[in-house]
């Protein structure tokens, strides 16, 4: 694919946490070949035997998980969802965006399938640790409220404006199309939460993995259908 490039693999200088040889890379259901996966603090990279590969920046990774559902994919693997398009899909998405008024965020699904499935836990842990080093700037900004303070005393004297508050129903009407789509997606993810474990499109977080913001274990119980189905995962 055209997005595959030649570059030196990340080393200790980039904080290499995990190097997993004999790992097959799959993008949106299409195999890219077998190579080595490099999980470094700076980026997530994969290179095939010829030295061609790709790198993923952590801020673009919206979800990573260990998938053990053999109904969704025939082999256990590390699943990574990225907010971007790659290869031919990136060209198609540009054309679609020109014809569409909706601001739809691009999504790509990667599956990294190691020949040694026992390495999945170490791969998952390394991903969680590296992802934590790259917090979402939007989350940080939300902690610092820069808006004007509401002066109760001024309001009582008729000198201040009443801040606008919305009920749940009213708030929905003020959401943008993108906001509504995001809300619907999140509600769908949370609708199957059960006691201490939460099922989100086949992804389950348990107490042992709650410390990881973006990482989660996949539910292996047969009661959840459609876990990590291609092109409709989410997160």
Swiss-Prot record:
GO annotation, cellular component aspect: cytoskeleton; cytosol; membrane; methylosome; nucleus; pICln-Sm protein complex; plasma membrane; protein-containing complex
Nucleus is among the record's keywords: yes
One Pfam entry name: Voldacs
GO biological process, one term: mRNA cis splicing, via spliceosome
Location(s), subcellular: Cytoplasm, Cytosol; Nucleus; Cytoplasm, Cytoskeleton
Annotated Basic and acidic residues bias: 204-213
Modified residues (Phosphoserine): 100, 142, 191, 193, 196, 208
InterPro entries: ICln (IPR003521), ICln/Lot5/Saf5 (IPR039924), PH-like_dom_sf (IPR011993)
Gene3D superfamilies xrefs: Pleckstrin-homology domain (PH domain)/Phosphotyrosine-binding domain (PTB) (2.30.29.30)
N-acetylserine modifications at: 2
Keywords: Acetylation, Cytoplasm, Cytoskeleton, mRNA processing, mRNA splicing, Nucleus, Phosphoprotein
GO molecular function ontology, one term from the record: small molecule binding
Superkingdom of source: Eukaryota
Comp. bias intervals (Acidic residues): 137-151
The protein's role, per its UniProt record: Involved in both the assembly of spliceosomal snRNPs and the methylation of Sm proteins. Chaperone that regulates the assembly of spliceosomal U1, U2, U4 and U5 small nuclear ribonucleoproteins (snRNPs), the building blocks of the spliceosome, and thereby plays an important role in the splicing of cellular pre-mRNAs. Most spliceosomal snRNPs contain a common set of Sm proteins SNRPB, SNRPD1, SNRPD2, SNRPD3, SNRPE, SNRPF and SNRPG that assemble in a heptameric protein ring on the Sm site of the small nuclear RNA to form the core snRNP (Sm core).
Subunit description: Component of the methylosome, a 20S complex containing at least PRMT5/SKB1, WDR77/MEP50 and CLNS1A/pICln. May mediate SNRPD1 and SNRPD3 methylation. Forms a 6S pICln-Sm complex composed of CLNS1A/pICln, SNRPD1, SNRPD2, SNRPE, SNRPF and SNRPG; ring-like structure where CLNS1A/pICln mimics additional Sm proteins and which is unable to assemble into the core snRNP. Interacts with LSM10 and LSM11.
Membership in a protein family: Belongs to the pICln (TC 1.A.47) family.
Name of the protein in question: Methylosome subunit pICln
Organism: Canis lupus familiaris (Dog)
């Amino acid at each position: 694919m055209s997005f595959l490039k030649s570059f030196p693999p990340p080393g200790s200088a980039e904080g290499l946490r995990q190097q997993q040889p004999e790992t097959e890379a799959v993008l949106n259901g299409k195999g890219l070949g077998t190579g080595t996966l490099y999980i470094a603090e700076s980026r997530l990279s994969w290179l095939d035997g010829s030295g061609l590969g790709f790198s993923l920046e952590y801020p673009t990774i919206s979800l990573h998980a260990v998938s053990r559902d053999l109904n969704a994919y025939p082999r256990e693997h590390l699943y990574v969802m990225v907010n971007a398009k790659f290869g031919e899909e990136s060209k198609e998405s540009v054309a679609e965006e020109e014809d569409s008024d909706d601001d739809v965020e691009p999504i790509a699904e990667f599956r990294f399938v190691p020949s040694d499935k026992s390495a999945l836990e170490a791969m998952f842990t390394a991903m969680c640790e590296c992802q934590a080093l790259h917090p979402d700037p939007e989350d940080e900004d939300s902690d610092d409220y820069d808006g004007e303070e509401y002066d109760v005393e001024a309001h009582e004297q008729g000198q201040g404006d009443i801040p606008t508050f919305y009920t749940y129903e009213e708030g929905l009407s003020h959401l943008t199309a993108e906001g509504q789509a995001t809300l619907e997606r999140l509600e769908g993810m949370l609708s199957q939460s059960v006691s201490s474990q939460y099922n989100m499109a086949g992804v389950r977080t348990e107490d042992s993995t709650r410390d990881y913001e973006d990482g989660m274990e996949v539910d292996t119980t047969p009661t959840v259908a459609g876990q990590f189905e291609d092109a409709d995962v989410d997160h």
